[in-house]
Amino acid sequence: LATAPRVPGFTVLDAAVMVDQWRTGDPDNRMLNPDQWQRVGALLAGLTPVQRASLDDLLAAAGSSTQRALLLSTLASGATIEQVRFVADAIRSKSDAEIVRMLALNTDEPTGRTGATYDGAPVIQDPTTGNTCGSTSLLGLVARVDPMLALWLTSGQRAPGWNPPYLAHLTDAQWRGTTFLERFIAAQHSVLTTTDSDLSTWVEAVGTPPWGAAALASLGSSTTYESVLYDDQDPELTRELMSRAAAAANNGTPVPFYVGDDHVPRHVMLITGYADGYYTVYEPGSGSVTRVPESVMLGTGKPDAFGGWAHIDYLVLPVT
């Protein structure tokens, strides 16, 4: 701590967390993205001395810099000090690897043919309806930046007073779901209703519209998103957009993207990282996590990684 830089609005402990996180070799493993850090700075400035002292105590008691970063991420999501304390108690015994796995819903590492699982359950969209791929991808996005969501989905532990607008359509019984998959599928349908009815006018049966996805991603995170039409017949545009997607995912802001045929978007997937010419992509239909070559994402390679569809139609990107 003695060598940590002094940053206006941040204590030495805060700055130490920032330095440690930015030294992480793989940027995908950073706990907070730049937008979250900006939000943290603004929120810290608004805390009362008593609140700030309570937060400092929680940060000092955390078992690792990853746990401290998680608590600041919780604060960035809009949590109260009481909610931050709840999360601190819930993750106190978790290892750094378990925390990363919780936030990513275990969808960060390539899975091969088996698909991602959490506590033995597949991390997939509702197989009975076929229209929650968008909301599933959005949950994968928001869980990375809202530890209270990730904690509830993976363990059923709900922070006091936590009731985000995108989960407002859950019943009491659904809030008390006993398994990861029960809670995950219930949350998918609440998000679907939110994007289609609360945030846009859309037919729920056909899934989440790109603009609804952008609105919910902005609502559930510290980042403002926009939906962008993707034309794979325009090489300059596709390269620009995929470069934005790679940079965003590597900054900790995953990117939903829509795939389909020549005319209509049919499915939604999630870009979670980029390295060495490959995009890490989560496909909610099967739960698979694959490394997709850049040539495929640019529309110049075999499109066998798009859930059976041939083209990218939309990207939901952070506003630059």
Residue ranges of model-derived segments:
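Active-site signature of cysteine proteases
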Residues: 3-16, 28-31, 239-243, 247-251, ...
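Short amphipathic alpha-helical segments that mediate assembly, nucleic-acid/protein binding
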Residues: 12-15, 36-40, 51-55, 67-68, ...
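Active-site nucleophile-adjacent alpha helix/oxyanion-hole segment immediately C-terminal to the catalytic cysteine
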Residues: 35, 86-196, 256
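Active-site nucleophilic cysteine motif
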Residues: 126-143, 203-216, 267
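Low-complexity, serine/threonine/proline-enriched polar segments
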Residues: 185-215
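Long, positively charged binding patches that form subdomain-scale interaction surfaces
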Residues: 205, 211-264
